[in-house]
Amino acid sequence: MAAIKPITTYKGKIVPLFNDNIDTDQIIPKVHLKRISKSGFGPFAFDEWRYLPDGSDNPDFNPNKPQYKGASILITGDNFGCGSSREHAAWALKDYGFHIIIAGSFSDIFYMNCTKNAMLPIVLEKSAREHLAQYEEIEIDLPNQTVSSPDKRFHFEIDETWKNKLVNGLDDIAITLQYESLIEKYEKSL
């Protein structure tokens, strides 16, 4: 009973954004947090870097460059998603089109928010990220915990609980529903 789209293998276009300490306010500025739904935040992702003061695209911002248009894998620096615990940051990146984020490290809360929103956060050393950033596309194999370029494969760690959720397309509600009969049995015993 999948509630989110399962992630097993994924091949996609990359965009490098090698800044360290990108916080949730840089990912989605608080001025844009006026919605209660998870959608509609994509146009505001990286708002202050993505657009010039006149509202036009900033040509120096990597995701705006023609060679990176349509990228679904973000390769970034250390301590990604630090700052406040706003889940809107994960919503904005997902709505923008990212499915995988590869960083040197993540804020714990941001990491959890990614997995809860069917995005795979991957931690890799800087040398691996720099290698992968040379290619237009890379491939992720979640069951085997690898990220591959055409000439090299890197292993990554992920907690088995998060891996199981993502591979099987399970959100928290779907996991709870797996125990529905036990819950009903307990309720009847009260």
UniProtKB/Swiss-Prot annotation:
Keywords: Amino-acid biosynthesis, Branched-chain amino acid biosynthesis, Leucine biosynthesis, Lyase. InterPro entries: 3-IsopropMal_deHydase_ssu, Aconitase/3IPM_dehydase_swvl, AconitaseA/IPMdHydase_ssu_swvl, IPMI_Swivel, LeuD. Signal peptide: none annotated. Transmembrane segments: none annotated. Its EC number is 4.2.1.33. Pathway: Amino-acid biosynthesis; L-leucine biosynthesis; L-leucine from 3-methyl-2-oxobutanoate: step 2/4. It catalyses: (2R,3S)-3-isopropylmalate = (2S)-2-isopropylmalate. Pfam families: Aconitase_C. GO terms for molecular function: 3-isopropylmalate dehydratase activity. Disulfide bonds: none annotated. One of its GO terms (biological process) is L-leucine biosynthetic process. One of its GO terms (cellular component) is 3-isopropylmalate dehydratase complex. Catalyzes the isomerization between 2-isopropylmalate and 3-isopropylmalate, via the formation of 2-isopropylmaleate. Heterodimer of LeuC and LeuD. Belongs to the LeuD family. LeuD type 1 subfamily. This is 3-isopropylmalate dehydratase small subunit. It comes from Staphylococcus aureus (strain JH9). The gene is leuD.
